[in-house]
Amino acid sequence: KQKFEECQRLLLDIPLQTPHKLVDTGRAAKLIQRAEEMKSGLKDFKTFLTNDQTKVSDEESKDSRAGATTAADVSGAPNTETTGPTLEWDNYDLREDALDDSVSSSSVHASPLASSPVRKNLFRFGESTTGFNFSFKSALSPSKSPGKLNQSGASVGTDEDSDVTQEEERDGQHFEPVVPLPDLVEVSSGEENEQVVFSHRAKLYRYDKDAGQWKERGIGDIKILQNYENKQVRIVMRRDQVLKLCANHRITPDMTLQNMKGTERVWVWTACDFADGERKIEHLAVRFKLQDVADSFKKIFDEAKVAQEKDFLITPHVARSATPRESPCGKMAVAVLEETTRERTDLSQGDDAADTTSEVGGVSGTPEPTTKAVVSPPKFVFGSESVKSIFSSEKSKPFAFGNSSATGSLFGFSFNTPLKNNSSEASSAAQSGSERKVEPGGRQESQNSDLKSASDGKVKNTSPAFLKEQFSTSHTFKTPEKVEERKKPEDLPSDDDVLIVYELTPTPEQRALASRLQLPPTFFCYKNRPDYISEEEEDDEDFDTAVKKLNGKLYLDDSETCRLSEENVTDNEKECVIVWEKKPTVEELAKADTLKLPPTFFCGICSDTDEDNGNAEDFQSELQKVQEAQKSQDENIASSADGMCTDDTKVTVPFLCKSEEPEFTTKSVSSPSVSSGTVDKPVDLSTRKENDADSTSQVESKTVTFGFGSGPGLSFADLASSNSGDFAFGSKDKNFQWANTGAAVFGAQSTSKVGEDEDGSDEEVVHNEDIHFEPIVSLPEVEVKSGEEDEEILFKERAKLYRWDREASQWKDRGVGDIKILWHTVKNYFRILMRRDQVFKVCANHVITKTMELKPLNVSNNALVWTASDYADGEAKVEQLAVRFKTKEMADCFKKKFEECQQNLLKPQKGQDSLTAEFSKETNPVVFFDICADDEPLGRITMELFSNIVPKTAENFRALCTGEKGFGFKSSIFHRVIPDFVCQGGDITKHDGTGGRSIYGDKFEDENFDVKHTGPGLLSMANRGQDTNNSQFFITLKKAERLDFKHVVFGFVKDGMDTVKKIESFGSPKGSVSRRIIITECGQI
């Protein structure tokens, strides 16, 4: 009872999971209410604590803890791991020694001794604590219900009291389930009493008979299972992840595996499959990745059939297991899980067993045996052990990075306040510290830092702070990574699992350079790669060689030589040939020196262009020719003073400088003291003489100034400030006008240049629209036929066509283009044709019949609707069409023309007698048929052919009746008879309506449609479309206007309509004939 009350008080004092939130009165009341509700769960604790056997176990546990200190004692967690997950309830030790107030001397790990256990008080708001620490650890997800504690303090998950949840973990409300569900549901796959004989990953297909192709059924492990009891064998395959059945049937003796054509890794068979729950015959195929797996499947399949007959178990195929699939979590997550499991199970054992010379916490002992357990992925949770480590009042541990705490911290470091040295054992342990060595597999191993190895006794101090006997109040930081770097490679323990394939090592020069620049030693190792190309290295050997062959040089040997002055260049240099050099005159040199400009600054301002250098003739000789040509010109042309150009550079001629374009670099710059007072006209350099005697052109070089009396310190700011609104360089001329003003800037040049070589001209080719290019290969012209060549356009307007979609019950666009009404002048029929814009695809193509009726659309006055058998898609299809024009006048015009075409078709049609009187002539040939039905004579049919209207068609029929071409209608049959419609025959090749042959070859064209199908007894040609006539024909049994303009009428029954009626009696609506109707004899009368 006393123990139960203590447990109840502890439960009431459970701290919040979010310590940053203050507890208000309402929250406290809720906690008290929940504690009362948890009394039912405490019954299990009371039973556990009052059990005598449990007390004995507690005493034994205390004795074992007195002999050995493990990492689990710090957090109160058990040293032995169990399969149950760690819960927050495990953080509170409910044993008697947990309430002891005595505090023993703690070590670096702060492990309490069994003789003087540390009281594990919980944090309470308002109470002061002696220390504060913070640690990261891999907390485990809590279970639904609080588990029982075993004898060692481990939490064992139970199925009882599952409705009691940890309310402190969340701030939300608690919802009770409406229907309680059991915690554990037994999953049964139906394969429990069967052994897996074969299992491998494959892809399954089934044959779809409707589509006529193989379709994928699923991907997964296909298994061959055998029942232990009845020895029955079946094939089961489930899809990956969803585990849905895609194959489930038994293997019967009559099943056979066959290879699919084209591949040997695919097996095909037929079975009664139950994958969908019902019996269904399926044609299945399975494809494996490797050939040997496919062969193994075949072998096991055959063995299964024999095993069922002889009633014995098959030896499972273990040569190859199921293909492993990658885990959803990555390799790093798996490594973390393995590391966490290893730390929780082996860390404390490895520390105590490996290092017997160093004491951890001042106590050595034998650890308790541990068992492996599956640990959930680590995550940080406020609660569990963290509650005690954050808000505990026990003595704090010294701060250290990398300390191997017993909590199995995943992050490997903790924040603790420094601790006073209470014992020599604790001091020595604190001075030595602990180091973490990270192995390649991710495992962390704790080693003593003052030992170099297990057999080496040399002490190695890692930090000056640890040399002191007494710890100061300041925190001490220790970085085990730096310590590990100081270790020599031979000191580190070798790992057989790591194989060094390649090591990147720098050269001594690269190492020295990296050390001087304070960079990593391998920083410049990228230069050692074979594909590395340095940008600083000159890769110009091939170019230098080529240039030296031309007595030239591409690059200078020294960068200093790039700044050679003119006086260093001599005429006798072999690698540089000076063709022509322009030197400044005395005046130009004086001007440049006055204005602090280069000596050659004023050279070539007026005449030095690109075209000068491109001429093959010498500059001086060409200049002399120009001077002589200019002497014949007018010598009275005035010129203004130009102090910027000399005799050499002032001359500008059409050959040396384009006279059509103004030269903007030839502005005259003069001083007021030397400017002319009488001549203010601009200088035309193209007409100016070289030796001009005008005094305005003779300027002393020493008196030339740039601007208004500027000295050596001239600046553009001074020019701007002294400007009074007039020109800064001389006076403004009111009559000033640029040369060639108004001329075309980008026009073609009308005159050719004097003395220019025609072959070596670099001038740009002027665009000419009359340039004509002849094709290299002449292509023949392709004649495009649209089928409208023999037709006359009666109407043509742009419109938009619609068709009525019966399934969607709405109008849909058919196309936009020109709709036409065409009249065939030869065949005498009318049709509507419309093609889409640009693509010219046919969107309407049908003949106009007298039964068609145009009706206006209800929603628009310029839209018309009609129904027709349209051939836009190549086949006849009844479509309801609508056309919309831009205006109502266009729609009325279309309707008027449409009705006129119908009136031409509705001309008084003559009956059978009138047709006979009109088309019948004595010169027309007459032929006959003798008909027999299953050897029973029916009579003779006499027919007259319209050779005067369709001579070609009539001649074909006559020749087939006489058989003069070696083949004909004799012994042929009437293969299709439809009452009240037609009697069709004439298939002299296949006798089923798919053959036929004419005397002109395979087929011939339609002649005309002058004669319509106005009544019974008319002979007409059967065809498969336009211009596909052969030997097949039909006799009409009734008026058939829908056949007009499609079939050519070439005769009529003159005598024997009673025989035709007898043939009609053997027909059917579908066209099949009940008796065999044969033409026993035929010919011409």
From Swiss-Prot:
PTM info? Polyubiquitinated by PRKN, which leads to proteasomal degradation. The inner channel of the NPC has a different redox environment from the cytoplasm and allows the formation of interchain disulfide bonds between some nucleoporins, the significant increase of these linkages upon oxidative stress reduces the permeability of the NPC.
- Ranges for the region named Interaction with SUMO1 are 552-627
Q: What is its EC number?
A: 2.3.2.-
Q: Which residues form the PPIase cyclophilin-type domain?
A: 928-1084
Give positions of region: Interaction with BICD2. Answer: 12-152
Chain residue numbers at which the record places covalent cross-link Glycyl lysine isopeptide (Lys-Gly) (interchain with G-Cter in SUMO2): 388, 460, 478, 658, 681
- Cross-link Glycyl lysine isopeptide (Lys-Gly) (interchain with G-Cter in SUMO1): located at? 460
On whether Repeat is a keyword of this UniProt record, the answer is: yes
UniProt-listed Pfam families: IR1-M, Pro_isomerase, Ran_BP1
User: Which keywords does the record carry?
Assistant: Disulfide bond, Isopeptide bond, Membrane, mRNA transport, Nuclear pore complex, Nucleus, Phosphoprotein, Protein transport, Repeat, RNA-binding, Transferase, Translocation, Transport, Ubl conjugation, Ubl conjugation pathway
What top-level class of enzyme does the UniProt entry assign? transferase
Q: Which residues carry this modification: Phosphotyrosine?
A: 532
What does the tissue specificity note say?
Answer: Retina.
> Which residue ranges does the record annotate as region Interaction with sumoylated RANGAP1?
497-501
The sequence repeats lie at 125-126, 382-383, 401-402, 411-412, 499-551, 577-627, 706-707, 708-709, 729-730, 746-747, 967-968, 1050-1051, 1066-1067
One GO cellular component, as annotated: nuclear membrane
Phosphothreonine carried by residues: 18, 158, 479, 609
What is known about what this protein does?
A: E3 SUMO-protein ligase which facilitates SUMO1 and SUMO2 conjugation by UBE2I. Involved in transport factor (Ran-GTP, karyopherin)-mediated protein import via the F-G repeat-containing domain which acts as a docking site for substrates. Binds single-stranded RNA (in vitro). May bind DNA. Component of the nuclear export pathway. Specific docking site for the nuclear export factor exportin-1. Inhibits EIF4E-dependent mRNA export. Sumoylates PML at 'Lys-490' which is essential for the proper assembly of PML-NB.
Query: How does the annotation summarize its subunit structure?
Result: Part of the nuclear pore complex. Forms a complex with NXT1, NXF1 and RANGAP1. Forms a tight complex with RANBP1 and UBE2I. Interacts with SUMO1 but not SUMO2. Interacts with PRKN. Interacts with sumoylated RANGAP1. Interacts with CDCA8. Interacts with PML (isoform PML-4). Interacts with BICD2. Interacts with MCM3AP isoform GANP. Interacts with COX11. Interacts with synaptic plasticity regulator PANTS.
Annotated family: Belongs to the RanBP2 E3 ligase family.
Task: Give the protein's recorded name.
Answer: E3 SUMO-protein ligase RanBP2
Q: What gene, per UniProt, encodes this protein? A: RANBP2
